[in-house]
């Protein structure tokens, strides 16, 4: 444990993430998770204190990239009646569920258990933060759940996302993670094809539905604190990172309104 938590090893891990061509926010997530493990190990006396251990690696968040779709394009993506190849249709249904279930992360959707869905409500714990989330399932979402339900009697999963015909359930944590990573890569590839098939101007990824839910709520004047709770974020600061790219747009629109109002008043005075 002590050999893991030294400055050279942390820098080596960051270089490994860079070599994998990961985006800065993804790298930051891995490094912040490692920092959380270090802090717990430190409290438990399993490792020693290393000053500035994470000082020179990137643990921030960038908010300069918009991942959300405009409402009209999101509406197209949710239109399940569109004629598509079977595999693209499956990806579209999963994507729609991410949005309809209050911007649920794909990591949580894939791991939902059959026992999590009861009396029209899904109750689960977020993989990332451990926070318990309760989501009322709309009729539209319930129909999509029925369409992609995991009907294997030995499978604990609500949806037919993880595992294949050769799987023996229950999956171990390592095997579940391996299956999830494989499915996630395929899902993102299919979403790119789906965006092209639907002729969407924006890109689709497993994050798009969640970001679109958050930004749509923001533009319809839902309080940031409410959005944060709905998404199960660890703090409002995380939510603000989602929404920061849209702040300048809103400020620019406000500025134009103020200028127009002042000019209108000056004309009346004249």
Language-model features, listed with the residues they occupy:
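Basic, Lys/Arg- and aromatic-enriched nucleic-acid-binding interface segment
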Residues: 24, 28, 49-106, 110
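N-terminal core-binding DNA-recognition domain of tyrosine recombinases/integrases
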Residues: 1-65, 80
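Short, basic (Lys/Arg/His-rich) helix/loop patches that form interaction surfaces
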Residues: 79, 83-86, 179-181, 185-229
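Short, polar N-cap/turn motifs at the start of nucleic acid-interacting alpha helices
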Residues: 115-121, 201-202, 222-241, 268-270
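Conserved tyrosine-mediated DNA breakage-rejoining catalytic core shared by Y-recombinases
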Residues: 4, 55, 111-147, 163-164
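Active-site/catalytic core of tyrosine-dependent DNA strand-transfer enzymes
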Residues: 74, 139-201
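Catalytic-site neighborhood detector that most strongly recognizes the C-terminal catalytic loop/helix
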Residues: 68, 126-130, 164, 231-256
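DNA/chromatin major-groove-contacting recognition/catalytic segments
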Residues: 136-139, 148, 244-270
